[in-house]
């Protein structure tokens, strides 16, 4: 398998990997909020938004790659 064949597999893996972490981040943001750590919750929430943006970009890259 050459790199061109591997690339969509790798991108799909990255997306799935990120999504699995997002669930955990959401849980811990909630826990931080419950502990009264609103600043920490805000930082984690910001990280969630950044990772969601990253996933969106990776999905566009995958879509573009699959259209070729």
Predicted regions and their residues:
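N-terminal acidic leader/helix
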Residues: 1-29
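Short, charge-rich amphipathic interface segments used for partner binding and complex assembly
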Residues: 28-64
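Short acidic DE-rich linear segments
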Residues: 66-68
């Amino acid at each position: 398998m050459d790199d061109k064949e591997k690339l969509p597999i790798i991108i799909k893996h990255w997306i799935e990997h990120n999504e699995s972490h997002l669930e955990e981040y959401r849980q811990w943001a909630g826990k931080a909020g419950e502990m009264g750590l609103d600043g920490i919750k805000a930082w984690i929430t910001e990280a969630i938004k950044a990772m969601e943006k990253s996933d969106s970009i990776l999905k566009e890259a995958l879509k573009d790659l699959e259209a070729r």
